[in-house]
Amino acid sequence: KKICIVSGDPNSINSEIIFKSWNKLNKKTKNKIILIGNYELLKKQRKKINIPINLNKIDKIERIKTHDNSLKIIDYPLKFNDCFKVKKTQAAKYVLGSLNLAHQLCIKNEIKGFINCPIEKNLIKKKGIYGVTEFLGKKNPSNKFSEVMLLHNKKLSVVPLTTHIKIKDISKYIKKNLIIKKINTLNIFYKRLFKKEPRIVVLGLNPHNCELEKNSEEVKIIIPAIKELKKKYNIVGPMVADNFFKDSYKNFDVVVGMYHDQVLIPFKNFFKFDAINITLGLNYLRISPDHGTAKDIIGKNKANPKSLLKCIKFFDNFK
């Protein structure tokens, strides 16, 4: 079983966390890894950050030789002058193209899924697409499932109902059918991945759940959705969000919030690099490190590879 890693944003710490992770892996795991990226770019970045690693360019997965100690790279084209300052137009083509290639390899069943390293959202942002989760959701259309962003640590997982949208627009997106479809997807895929029925809690949207006023989103949308979902799943809510993450979260496996920062701020504060991002609802497994491109430390050899290593371990154990 191959572990495919997509190198992601060229203007980032990605090559550094890939190289550092590689040097911490055992030979058996190394033999499973293929990287989609630009060979020349990675060579130049390796030289700049001065991390010893052997790189080997390949053109097809089946031609991988497993007996050597080199990182196998499926070379994807990229035009650049400075290896850490690639122009935005070229970086966008590279990121979209390499994600598309990984998707096609999954569709052809050459790989079971992939890990993508961090990507600046502006490189793939267009109408209706705000991040990799939505990008892959559009490529995996389903009437039954919806793409779901699950941030996972062994102690807790969180799901934002809405992902990379502006705060002022959140209430427009919150619909009963969306809540039901997302939580259906969450429950089914969580059981597949973790072999257990999740204990799910849903947070309200408004401060103090707007004291459950009759025109609030809680009363009109969230409570009716939860009432319907309770017939099938272990789910409660809506809970008031402001003090929920003090202790109450410990009674649940998954916390579903109404928007991105409602659940990601406390989650990242708890677990920092000790977490991964999983997209549920796809025809294959897609995971990524739970952090961004860290442009402030590019090329400084200060990046922490822990989250990528967790991704590799999770993927390697996936059956």
Residue ranges, per PLM feature:
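Anion-binding alpha/beta catalytic cores of soluble intermediary-metabolism enzymes, centered on
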Residues: 1-319
